[in-house]
From Swiss-Prot:
Signal peptide start and end residues: none
Official protein name in the record: Large ribosomal subunit protein uL4
InterPro entries: Ribosomal_uL4, Ribosomal_uL4-like, Ribosomal_uL4_dom_sf
GO molecular function: rRNA binding; structural constituent of ribosome
GO cellular component, one term: ribosome
Gene giving rise to this polypeptide: rplD
Lineage: Bacteria, Bacillati, Bacillota, Clostridia, Eubacteriales
The keyword rRNA-binding appears for this protein: yes
Pfam families assigned to the protein according to its UniProt record, in alphabetical order: Ribosomal_L4
Length: 206
C-alpha cells in the first residue's frame, strides 16, 4: 500500500497518508492512457474545416487558352489546383472526430495516471486548502513550498476563494475532483491534491 507525506498548505509535514493500492498502486497501463487521451483530444475537435475541390469551384468551364502555339504550358481549366483560386487537392470536409471509450478503460487509465504520479513522487497531498479571501500570493507561496511550477490542483469542493486565487497563475489549473481526467493529470508536472479529494477518488475508483 503506497504511503505519502501529508502536508498543510504552508508546506509543513503533518503526518503520513496510506493510499489505496487499488487506485494508487496499480500496474501502469500506458495503452489505456494513450487511448483515453487520444479520445479526449479528438472529442474537442470541431471538425468544421472545409475547402472546395476543383469540381466545386465556380467558373473555369472553358479552356483558358488554346492547346498549342501560345508558348505557354497547356491548361484545361482555371479551377485546376495549380491556379490561384483553383480547387484544393483532397480538400478537407466537415467530419465527426468523436471517439467512444469504454468506462472500464477510462477507469484503468485514470488509476494508471495517478499511480504514475505517486511512483515518480510528483503527487503532493495537502490536508486542506482554505483562504479567508482570494489571495493569489498565498497559493503561489504554497506551490513554491512544494517546488511546484506546472501544477494541477485537485480539491474535493473547490472553494470560491481558492479557485479565484489559483485561476490566474501561469501554468496552474485547479479543478474539483469530479472533473478529474487523464489528460490533465498527465499534462501537468505535479499534482497537488487535498486529503478529501483523495478519499473521494478512492471511493469512486477503488
Amino acid at each position: 500500500m503506497p504511503k505519502v507525506d501529508l502536508f498543510n498548505q504552508n508546506g509543513e509535514k503533518v503526518g503520513d497518508l496510506q493510499l489505496a493500492d487499488s487506485v494508487f498502486g496499480v500496474e501502469v497501463n500506458t495503452y489505456a492512457m494513450h487511448q483515453v487521451v487520444k479520445a479526449l483530444l479528438a472529442n474537442k475537435r470541431q471538425g468544421t474545416q472545409s475547402a472546395k475541390t476543383r469540381a466545386e469551384v465556380s467558373g473555369g468551364g472553358i479552356k483558358p487558352w488554346r492547346q498549342k502555339g501560345t508558348g505557354r504550358a497547356r491548361q484545361g481549366s482555371i479551377r485546376a489546383p495549380q491556379w490561384i483560386h483553383g480547387g484544393v487537392v483532397f480538400a478537407p470536409k466537415p467530419r465527426d472526430y468523436r471517439m467512444s471509450i469504454p468506462k472500464s478503460m477510462k477507469k484503468v487509465a485514470i488509476k494508471s495516471a495517478l499511480t504514475s504520479k505517486v511512483n515518480e513522487n510528483l503527487m503532493v497531498v495537502v490536508d486542506e486548502i482554505k483562504l479567508e479571501t482570494p489571495k493569489t500570493k498565498e497559493v503561489v507561496k504554497m506551490l513554491n513550498s512544494f517546488n511546484a511550477k506546472k501544477t494541477l490542483i485537485i480539491t474535493n469542493n473547490a472553494e470560491e476563494n481558492v479557485y479565484k486565487s489559483a485561476r490566474n497563475i501561469e501554468g496552474v489549473q485547479i479543478i474539483p475532483v469530479n472533473n478529474i481526467n487523464v489528460y490533465d493529470v498527465l499534462k501537468y508536472d505535479k499534482v497537488v491534491i487535498t486529503k478529501d479529494a483523495v478519499s473521494k477518488i478512492e471511493e469512486v475508483y477503488a
